[in-house]
């Protein structure tokens, strides 16, 4: 009898630990998806604002509430399927192209929630819905006015970035975003405007290295 009780107690202990671990994993996944998560800068497209190998904390509350970002916000979003839109594709639509998401519930969860095999870009919001964006003579014009971009390095000019999206109206429900390192950034100049539902997070603070820890100014 005593041996049976010990076995039952051991099984109960194991089950309690398993349940605790499962609950902790669920909480961690939900927190990462809806609230925030860390990430590492892996490309130079946002230099000098963000440098490679810096650690950032991403605020996902903006996606959770489906709030439109503001001009100057640094965001992350799902990388479009088509890297460069042709002139004929732009005439059809200036919105970035994405493949149809997995129809299988498990595949959709793995891709969208766990973000396994998902590629994301980090860029700065430049144009907002309804605004007329023109890239001309190395400058960016919004509704006919040159925008001030103090975050760019001195001497940086904005060309077409090997793309054709240089004179257009930003469609409703989308944003136009570019990297601060304009010469080394594949961005909305190439693949078009990003739908709000594809925006994953807003960059909030640098968390590493410690000498640059803090909120990122626009």
Where does each model-flagged region fall?
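Aromatic-capped interface at the extracytoplasmic side
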Residues: 30-44
């Amino acid at each position: 009898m005593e041996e049976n009780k010990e076995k039952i107690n051991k099984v109960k202990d194991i089950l309690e630990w398993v349940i605790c671990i499962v609950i902790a994993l669920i909480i961690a996944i939900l927190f990462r998806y809806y609230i925030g998560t860390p990430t590492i800068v892996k490309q130079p497209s946002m230099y000098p604002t963000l440098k490679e190998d810096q650690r950032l904390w991403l605020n996902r509350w903006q996606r959770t509430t489906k709030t439109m970002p503001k001009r100057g916000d640094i965001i992350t979003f799902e990388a479009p399927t088509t890297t460069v839109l042709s002139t004929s594709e732009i005439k059809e639509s200036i919105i970035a192209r994405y493949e149809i998401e997995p129809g299988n519930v498990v595949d959709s969860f793995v891709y969208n929630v766990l973000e396994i095999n998902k590629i994301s870009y980090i860029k700065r919001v430049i144009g907002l819905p309804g605004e007329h964006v023109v890239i001309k003579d190395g400058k960016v014009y919004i509704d006919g006015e040159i925008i001030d971009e103090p975050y760019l390095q001195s001497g940086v000019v904005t060309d077409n970035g090997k793309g054709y999206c240089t004179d257009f109206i930003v469609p409703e429900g989308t944003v136009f975003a570019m990297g601060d390192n304009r010469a080394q950034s594949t961005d909305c100049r190439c693949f078009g405007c990003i739908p709000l539902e594809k925006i994953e997070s807003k960059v909030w603070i640098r968390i590493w290295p410690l000498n640059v820890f803090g909120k990122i100014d626009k």
